[in-house]
Structure formats: C-alpha cells, structure tokens
Amino acid sequence: MNPPTTSDSAQTQSRKADHIRICLEEDVQFRDTTNGLERYRFTHSCLPEIDRNDIDLSATFLGKKLNAPLLISSMTGGTEEAGIINQRLAGLAQHYKLAMGVGSQRVAVEKPQVADTFAIRKYAPDVLLFANVGAVQLNYKYGLDECLRIIDMLEADALILHINPLQECIQPRGDVNFRGLLDKINQLCSKLPVPAIAKEVGNGISGAMAEKLIAAGVQAIDVAGAGGTSWAKVEGERAENAMQRRLGRTFADWGMPTAECITSVRAIAPHIPLIASGGLRDGLDVAKAIALGADIAGLAMPFLQAAVESEAALQDLTEVLIAEITTVLFCTGNANLDQLKHSGSLQRLQ
C-alpha cells in the first residue's frame, strides 16, 4: 500500500471529529423507519416461578464469556476527544465484562501517531475487543498487512469489516468501488488470525447477503439495521455541495429495520454468531433482539452520549440496561438468555 498523503490523513481525521459533533448536536436519527422491534410484544408471566436475584444474563460470543449480552458498538477514534471516549468506554467494558468495538482504524493506518486513541487493551485486558476497518478499503490498496496492523493496534479478538455503500455515496470523496469485494473478503478471511465480523452501519444486512458473506469466510454478522442513527443524514450534514445534501435527505430513511434483519439472517444461518444493532435504545429492545435470535446486542448512541458526559453517566446507563434486561427475563419467567430465546414468549403483533 502506498503511504497516504498528509491531505488524506487530515481529511480522515477531520471526518472523525465531524461525526462525533454531528451525532451529538444534530438530529440525525431515522425519521420514519424504526428498528421494527415495536411490532413485537412479550407475553407477561404473572407468576414467574423464579427468583429475580438468580437470573443469569451471561452470554458467550466468539468463545469469550460476557457478563451481559451487550456490545459497546463501534463509534470513534483518531482524535484527542475520541481517545478519551474510547478510554472511558474500555474501562466500562472491563468493569462490567461487556464486548466493545472501536470506530474505523483507517485514520491510524494513514496517521500512525493517532494509533494511541485506539490502543485500549491496557484499559480492558479481559474484554472481547473488535478492531474495525471498512471492507471497501480492500479495493483501495488495503490488504492483509494493513489488517494485521489494525488488529495488533488493538490486540483485538476479532476484526469488523464494516460495509457501508450508502454512506460512501454521500460522503465527500467516498470510496464507491465495491466491485469484486466479496472475493477479496474471502481471500482476507482465509489468512486472518482472528475471526472476521461483517457489519453494516445502519442500513442492515439481509439473509441473502449474510449467506454470501458467510460463504466468503465471515464468522459472525452484525446486522446494524435501520432505526437508529442515519449515516445518510450524518454525511448530508457534512456535505460540501447541494447534490450530496439532497442525497442525504432522500436516503435518510433507507434500510432494513433491525428486527427484520435478525429474522432474515437467522432463517438462513441458524448457528452463525449474530449481533443485533441499529436503533436499540434500552434493555427491552435488547431482550426483544435476543428473543428474535441475536446472541448479543450492540448500542452506540446511548453509550456515546453518556461517555461525553462522565464515567458515572456510563455506569448509570449500564446499570439501567442490565436492570431492564433482567426485568424482561423475570416477567417472562426465564432464568437465562437461552431460556428466553426458546421460550416463545415474544409475539409479533397483528
């Protein structure tokens, strides 16, 4: 890979700062498209026949045990502010034994001096950590060597390959050559020392797409469905011209709802490790996603908002999420997550 120019590095770093600011200050949530989970309701058990204090929320993902089925979803890195956010999130993940992913590490490949903003293993020695790079970069001179650097930077347990065609269409100078990418993913997965996770960024992965990705060697799927933060709107806010701003508005609600993605992927891949993310905002959403077939659930915006406030705000959020998930299990008469998945207690509303 040729060294990136100073201009390329500066643009990538500026984009990272813009993303944090826009997500926190502007209305960039989906407007009409929801995560789809409101179409489901749990059957209440008035006599659970279990002790709430005995409920077990532990989950195992990619061979590592978590104390709760929560992933602090990929968000940021590459700036001083992002480094502080990642450090706080890593400390939280370590304290509660949650999984965590970081934002795209492309900026640290282009500008190695910001790699420390991603180097969070020292704050989370026991945590399931996911490194992250855009899959499309495999068509832009990234290969195994760059991916190994990204993994080593984080001492990661897995590598997220995020797939974001719509975002790239609207992003200034976006990388839009997706031709032949599946073959390159296949070649990369066959050589990686850790599992690869395919992840969308808020527009969803269908069962048909998941089937192709799994055949290419991907070992886990994060559906990252619609209903939360719209990256079309985010990039529209950053847009440099009227065309891009128009695209951001037109495609603000583009994508498959998260609930639909979960059921679609599970129908074709009953055993693939599956992450539900995309518009999950509380423990009830998490429990519904798991009952639909996900193994763990990822949240980004709630953790980002708390992280910029304080470590105490992060702990308060996590305690509430855990209490909400526990309450769902208690009020459906399920002592653990496996029972919840197989209980049939989640019903689709007519």
UniProtKB/Swiss-Prot annotation:
Family the entry assigns: Belongs to the IPP isomerase type 2 family.
E.C. code: 5.3.3.2
Molecular function, one GO term: magnesium ion binding
Subunit note: Homooctamer. Dimer of tetramers.
Cofactors, names only: FMN; NADPH; Mg(2+)
Compartment(s) of residence: Cytoplasm
Binding site for Mg(2+): E168
Chief localisation class: cytoplasm
Annotated Gene Ontology cellular component terms: cytoplasm
Classification via PANTHER family: ISOPENTENYL-DIPHOSPHATE DELTA-ISOMERASE
Function: Involved in the biosynthesis of isoprenoids. Catalyzes the 1,3-allylic rearrangement of the homoallylic substrate isopentenyl (IPP) to its allylic isomer, dimethylallyl diphosphate (DMAPP).
Catalytic activity as recorded in UniProt: isopentenyl diphosphate = dimethylallyl diphosphate
Name this protein carries in UniProt: Isopentenyl-diphosphate delta-isomerase
Chain residues that bind FMN: S73, S74, M75, T76, S104, N132, K199, T229, G279, L280, R281, A300, M301
Keywords, alphabetical: Cytoplasm, Flavoprotein, FMN, Isomerase, Isoprene biosynthesis, Magnesium, Metal-binding, NADP
Enzyme class, broadest EC rank: isomerase
Upper classification of the organism: Bacteria, Bacillati, Cyanobacteriota, Cyanophyceae, Nostocales
Binding residue positions for substrate: R15, K16, S104, Q105, R106, Q167
Pfam families reported in the protein's UniProt record: FMN_dh (PF01070)
GO biological process: isoprenoid biosynthetic process
